[in-house]
Swiss-Prot record:
The lineage of its organism: Bacteria, Pseudomonadati, Pseudomonadota, Gammaproteobacteria, Pseudomonadales. GO terms for biological process: response to hydroperoxide. NCBIfam families: PRK02101.1-1, PRK02101.1-3. One of its GO terms (cellular component) is cytosol. InterPro entries: YaaA. It comes from Ectopseudomonas mendocina (strain ymp) (Pseudomonas mendocina). Belongs to the UPF0246 family. This is UPF0246 protein Pmen_1032. Pfam families: H2O2_YaaD (PF03883). Signal peptide: none annotated. HAMAP family: UPF0246.
Length: 259
């Protein structure tokens, strides 16, 4: 079973990594192509393209300018440990054992507007480039056109490497939109996490994002390879709802946040 999650806007390059091990991203030539294009943008143009404040636009212009190969631990950090956001709060990889990192490396992928697909231990230099960015490029009008079917092909390679055909989608619609469902040699399992609010179960963004990370953590910690085991997920009060679920669309409900 292969999991995919979204990246995060917030990054942490200050905290020492929880493991000294690292790997190199497999698709840096494509990332470098985007970096070369983005370096031609002024901070004002970046602000307009990405809908950022002047301060954030300046920061990311500087990031694009300082991006360089080769990646090493002095200028980059493992992707799973560099991203900081609601998903990664739930995942909490800071306390992973080396065996946990091994399992994650085989079974978890992060989708990225700049890097395409990242493995957990892949070194990553800081960036901000959301998948939905309308960056006109040599392959089309946006990043979906830039990546085309390549992300799906790389996920197929990862599935084949583990001899499996199940993909657990824990990514947002924005990022999973870069995956061509029909091109995947996989059974795709989608998930929804709903919390009780005003008498109804609803998707609450903050909690749903964190729950995706919790589910990824659950799979890693339990070494799950059979999707049937997903139904036993019970972290922080969530429970599987057979009534609300379908075969490949699993719904988890929670009556009261425990965080």
């Amino acid at each position: 079973m292969l999991m995919v999650i979204s990246p995060a806007k917030t990054l942490d390059y200050e905290t020492p990594p929880a493991t000294p091990r690292f790997t190199q991203p497999e698709h840096l030539d494509h990332a470098q192509e985007l970096i070369a294009q983005l370096r031609d943008f002024s901070p004002a143009q970046i602000a307009e393209l990405m809908h950022l404040s002047d301060k954030l636009a300046g920061l990311n212009a500087a990031r694009f300018g300082s991006w360089e190969r080769p990646f090493n631990p002095s200028n980059a950090k493992q992707a799973l440990l560099a991203f900081k956001g609601d998903v990664y709060t739930g995942l909490h990889a800071e306390d992973f054992s080396e065996d946990d990192f091994d399992f994650a490396q085989a079974h978890l992928r992060m989708l990225s507007g700049l890097y395409g697909v990242l493995r957990p231990l892949d070194l990553m230099q800081p960036y901000r480039l959301e998948m939905g960015t309308k960056l006109v490029n040599g392959r089309g009008k946006d990043l979906y056109a830039f990546w085309g079917e390549r992300i799906s092909a790389w996920l197929n390679q990862a599935l084949a490497a583990q001899g499996d055909d199940v993909l657990l989608n824990l990514a947002s619609n924005e990022y999973f939109g870069a995956v061509k469902r029909k091109a995947l040699n996989a059974r795709i399992i989608d998930t929804e996490f709903k919390d009780l609010k005003n008498g109804q179960y609803k998707i609450i963004s903050f909690y749903a994002k964190k729950a995706r990370g919790l589910m990824a953590r659950y799979v890693i910690k339990e070494r799950l390879t059979n999707p049937e085991g997903l139904k036993d997920f019970n972290y922080q009060g969530y429970r599987y709802s057979a009534e609300h679920s379908k075969a490949d669309s699993l719904v988890f409900l929670r009556d009261q946040p425990l965080d």
